């Protein structure tokens, strides 16, 4: 469950390290986002010579949450932290690599590129 002001780590090689959620997209009164949801973020910490810099405002898709996601068989997939992958305006990933595991719930048409870049799909 990600809401405004939540700090997340970045799971790609775009150059950002830590980002903060500034808006949950998908409705005017929407408060929480989960795995697979698109959020608006601002970059709080970035590496030098990266593709993005501190202060940039971008979109991101959530790929891991501490809250986890419930599967239809009743199992819950949880992670140690909250992580996202940065997107450009066309909702394509900015980075060319994705670090860490990604859940199967991201397997919708929009994010198949992220699934193909991921080293492990749970």
UniProtKB/Swiss-Prot annotation:
One of the record's GO cellular component terms: cytosolic large ribosomal subunit
UniProt xrefs under InterPro entries: Ribosomal_uL14, Ribosomal_uL14_bac-type, Ribosomal_uL14_CS, Ribosomal_uL14_sf
Keyword terms, alphabetized: Ribonucleoprotein, Ribosomal protein, RNA-binding, rRNA-binding
Pfam families, A to Z: Ribosomal_L14 (PF00238)
SMART domains: Ribosomal_L14
GO biological process, one term: translation
Gene Ontology MF terms in the entry: large ribosomal subunit rRNA binding; structural constituent of ribosome
PANTHER family to which the protein is assigned, alphabetical: 50S/60S RIBOSOMAL PROTEIN L14/L23, LARGE RIBOSOMAL SUBUNIT PROTEIN UL14M
Similarity comment text for this entry: Belongs to the universal ribosomal protein uL14 family.
Function: Binds to 23S rRNA. Forms part of two intersubunit bridges in the 70S ribosome.
Subunit structure and binding partners: Part of the 50S ribosomal subunit. Forms a cluster with proteins L3 and L19. In the 70S ribosome, L14 and L19 interact and together make contacts with the 16S rRNA in bridges B5 and B8.
NCBIfam families from the UniProt entry: rplN_bact
The protein's name in its UniProt record: Large ribosomal subunit protein uL14
């Amino acid at each position: 469950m990600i809401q405004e002001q939540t700090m997340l780590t970045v799971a790609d090689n775009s150059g950002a390290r830590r980002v903060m959620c500034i808006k949950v997209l998908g409705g005017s009164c929407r408060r929480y986002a989960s795995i697979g949801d698109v959020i608006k973020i601002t970059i709080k910490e970035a590496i030098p010579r990266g593709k993005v810099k501190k202060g940039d405002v971008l979109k991101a898709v959530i790929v891991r949450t501490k809250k986890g996601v419930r599967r239809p068989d009743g199992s819950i997939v949880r992670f140690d932290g909250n992580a996202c992958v940065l997107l450009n305006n066309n909702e394509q990933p900015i980075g060319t690599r994705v670090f860490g595991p990604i859940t199967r719930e991201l397997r919708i048409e929009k994010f198949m590129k992220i699934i193909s870049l991921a080293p492990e799909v749970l």
